[in-house]
Amino acid sequence: MNQVKYPVLTEKTIRLLEKNQYSFDVNIDSNKTQIKKWIELFFNVKVISVNSHRLPKKKKKIGTTTGYTVRYKRMIIKLQSGYSIPLFSNK
């Protein structure tokens, strides 16, 4: 399933990690229930809540052509206490 693109690591999301909340950029067509089921199956965790918002598109200019960046939806996923998601492997 290619709904979840990648985890997001910013100052805000690092603060949210302390509250057992994880942030992911997902496909714009995904909805909360799809992402909740996918996270629970893939990472074997219990999801309490899922919050989402759409990121604004940004203007990109290449030469004389003007376009826009690819839009994603950002999901903030809150897990039940005792569960965690390993964002990076220890290899």
UniProtKB/Swiss-Prot annotation:
Record-linked HAMAP family: Ribosomal_uL23_B
InterPro entries, A to Z: Nucleotide-bd_a/b_plait_sf, Ribosomal_uL23-like, Ribosomal_uL23/eL15/eS24_sf, Ribosomal_uL23_CS
The gene coding this protein: rpl23
Function noted in UniProt: Binds to 23S rRNA.
Disulfide partners: none
An example Gene Ontology molecular-function term: rRNA binding
GO biological process: translation
Tree of life domain: Eukaryota
Location (main, coarse): plastid
Keyword tags: Chloroplast, Plastid, Ribonucleoprotein, Ribosomal protein, RNA-binding, rRNA-binding
Protein name: Large ribosomal subunit protein uL23c
Family statement drawn from the similarity comment of this UniProt entry: Belongs to the universal ribosomal protein uL23 family.
GO cellular component terms listed in the entry, alphabetical order: chloroplast; ribonucleoprotein complex; ribosome
Record flagged with keyword Mitochondrion: no
Subunit structure and binding partners: Part of the 50S ribosomal subunit.
Cell location: Plastid, Chloroplast
SUPFAM superfamilies named among the record's database cross-references: Ribosomal proteins S24e, L23 and L15e
